[in-house]
């Protein structure tokens, strides 16, 4: 459950390390975002040599949330942190590598490139 002002780790090598959610995409009254949802983020920490600089505004997809998520088969999944991957307008990741596990629900939201780059899909 990600809302405005939530800080997330970045799970790719785009150069950003920490971002803050500034908008949940999908309606003016939408408050929360979950796994597979696109949010607008502001970069709070970035590597000095990266293309993405501190203070820039990007779009990102959520790949891990620490709040447990109930799947249709009745099982629950929960991660240790909140993490996202910075994407472009065509749902392709800006980085070339993904760090850490990602949720299987990304496959249902058509983020196949992220799923194929991830070292583990849970």
Curated annotation (Swiss-Prot):
Entry protein name: Large ribosomal subunit protein uL14
Entry function: Binds to 23S rRNA. Forms part of two intersubunit bridges in the 70S ribosome.
Superkingdom, natural source: Bacteria
Keywords: Ribonucleoprotein, Ribosomal protein, RNA-binding, rRNA-binding
PANTHER family linked: 50S/60S RIBOSOMAL PROTEIN L14/L23, LARGE RIBOSOMAL SUBUNIT PROTEIN UL14M
Pfam families associated with the record: Ribosomal_L14
Assembly description: Part of the 50S ribosomal subunit. Forms a cluster with proteins L3 and L19. In the 70S ribosome, L14 and L19 interact and together make contacts with the 16S rRNA in bridges B5 and B8.
Ribonucleoprotein recorded as keyword: yes
């Amino acid at each position: 459950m990600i809302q405005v002002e939530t800080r997330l780790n970045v799970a790719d090598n785009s150069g950003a390390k920490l971002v803050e959610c500034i908008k949940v995409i999908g309606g003016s009254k939408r408050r929360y975002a979950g796994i597979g949802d696109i949010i607008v983020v502001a970069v709070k920490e970035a590597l000095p040599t990266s293309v993405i600089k501190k203070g820039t505004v990007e779009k990102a997809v959520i790949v891990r949330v620490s709040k447990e998520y109930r799947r249709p088969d009745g099982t629950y999944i929960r991660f240790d942190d909140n993490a996202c991957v910075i994407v472009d307008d065509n749902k392709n990741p800006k980085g070339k590598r993904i760090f850490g596990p990602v949720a299987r629900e990304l496959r249902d939201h058509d983020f196949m490139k992220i799923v194929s780059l991830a070292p583990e899909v849970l």
